[in-house]
Regions:
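Alpha-helical scaffold/interaction cores of sigma-54-like transcription cofactors
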Residues: 1-493
């Protein structure tokens, strides 16, 4: 049996092209009991991956390919796998540390010494083509590589594995593999076979190349760019077993390693920090909101004439907020926005559906009077809403860190985290970007994009379009470049 441990998903931003659902479907098709993801320097996909695997009866193996940088190493990686929940917490700490150490445009990275205090529950793989051992071996030779191996072995002990890969059978790869085999036998370190999986099938190679070119702002036909192997696709277990038929234990060890991993991430209910107050949160919010409304109306005689309308709307909103348990959330947001304004940090007027809240306006979370502009509170919050509402707040770019530090200090660093929003290719954007890296005429690509229906609420996929639109189907059947354009774009979409 064989378990893939190195899979780079789309969460390896602009580098990996594997989709989580594709990995799960691959496992079901090939009867794989377990599989891992190993995105570069992050754990963005770990929750989606874990939930999707468990739903399909597959054991998820969560890891990250962490960059190592210090006076001895540069641009090399270690694969760190969480074997249990403590390991996941330690891995999260290391990922966080890598971003805190990031300077200017450098890549997030850690040093070997950072592993000393955060290794419990973590399994370490020595790294593949860009691993610490391979890079050291190619630059300094076997003696120094053996010393680095000893350091890693001392840190991770029985949770340290040597990796062996067979991507292109180059002289460099063959020499290193011979060294690794000897090192494994000499030091009794288990050996695991891995493959660098960036895309699903071998025929997805061109699509992945286009993705890299889009990211690096270069062209597919560029001679001087670095290219990855065509073998960086998700091979079947039988293909991997055949590839390493002369050392079958390195495939069996992937299954043994998988058995050591026992972590299932679960979605948790929203837990907001409590507002420290003698009153309960509902009463405090109501008191503050009513007083703030009085202050707003007092200085505006036109609004004062509609006092009952404002008061009734405020009470209605407060009842909904209280019934849904979001009083504390409003108080927390109002607090750090008011703090920012008092400290001369520019704050935006408010965006999105949150601008429809009268409570938000009177508490100065937003600067827009929703009654004056006819904005609906129900778009922001209503009893039938499942997901938690959120305010879109803009802070001055140069001073936003001060606001974050204030919130961390008030509620505790362990209770504050930053979030990320992921963008994905839509049909037109995919065609334009792929057309550019293919160096197709801009007017030709633009004319094709005009044939794509624009419907953000219900976007049509390129595959659906090719099947349903006879004009587009005829165009790509008569032009090889256009056919390639649509094939690559639909894979990246």
């Amino acid at each position: 049996m064989f378990v893939h441990l190195r899979n780079y998903t789309q969460y390896s931003l602009s580098r990996g092209a594997l989709k989580v659902r594709e990995i799960v479907e691959y496992c079901l098709k090939n009867n794989c009991p377990a599989i891992g993801i190993s995105d570069f320097g992050n754990l963005f996909g770990s929750m989606e991956f874990s939930l999707s695997c468990v739903k399909s009866g597959i054991q998820p193996i969560i890891s990250s390919n962490i960059r190592i940088e210090d006076e001895n190493y540069s641009n090399c990686y270690l694969l760190l796998i969480a074997s249990n929940y403590l390991g996941y917490k330690n891995l999260s700490r290391l990922v966080t540390k890598s971003f805190f150490k990031k300077k200017n445009n450098s890549f997030p990275s850690i040093s070997i010494s950072d592993l000393n205090n955060n290794n419990e529950g973590i399994i370490c793989l020595s790294g593949g083509k860009d691993g610490v051992l391979r890079k050291t071996f190619e630059k300094f030779g076997g003696e120094k590589t053996s010393k680095i191996n000893s350091i890693l072995q001392n840190i991770f002990r029985e949770n340290f594995y040597l990796e062996i890969q067979r991507l292109d059978r180059t002289n460099s790869e063959l020499r290193f593999n011979d060294f690794i085999l000897n090192l494994s036998n000499k030091n009794k370190i288990p050996l695991v076979a891995t493959n660098e999986n960036y895309f699903l099938r071998q025929d997805f190679y061109e699509s992945h190349e286009a993705l890299i070119c889009i990211s690096e702002q270069t062209f597919i036909d560029s001679e001087h760019r670095e290219k990855i192997s065509r073998n960086c696709f998700l091979k079947s277990p039988s293909q991997m077993i055949e590839l390493f038929s002369d050392i079958p234990e390195c495939c069996q060890n992937t299954l043994n390693l998988a058995k050591k991993c026992n972590i299932l991430l679960e979605e948790k209910k929203t837990q907001l920090p409590r507002v420290v107050t003698e009153e309960d949160e509902d009463s405090l919010l109501k008191t503050q909101a009513l007083q703030a409304l009085e202050n707003k109306l007092k200085y505006d005689p036109l609004k004062d004439k509609h006092k009952k309308e404002y008061h009734d709307r405020l009470i209605t909103e407060l009842e909904i907020i209280q019934n849904m348990g979001y009083s504390g959330y409003f108080l927390i947001v109002a607090d750090f926005i008011q703090w920012a304004k008092k400290n001369n940090i520019p704050v935006g007027p408010g965006r999105g559906s949150g601008a429809g809240s009268l409570v938000a306006w009177v508490l100065t979370i937003t600067n827009l009077d929703p009654i004056k502009f006819g904005l609906l509170f129900e778009r922001f919050l209503n009893p039938e809403r499942v997901s938690m509402p959120d305010f879109d707040i803009d802070f001055c770019m140069e001073k936003r860190d001060e606001v974050i530090k204030y919130v961390q200090k008030k509620y505790g660093e362990l209770n504050v985290a930053q979030i990320i929003t992921f963008g994905s290719f839509q049909a037109r954007a995919a065609l334009r970007d792929v057309g550019r890296v293919m160096q197709l005429p801009l007017t030709q690509v633009d004319n094709i994009c005009k044939l794509i229906p624009y419907n953000p609420a219900n976007p049509v996929s390129l595959k659906e379009l090719v099947n349903d639109d006879t004009q587009i189907k005829k165009m790509i059947n008569n032009d090889k470049n256009l056919r390639t354009l649509f094939e690559i774009s639909s894979n990246l979409e």
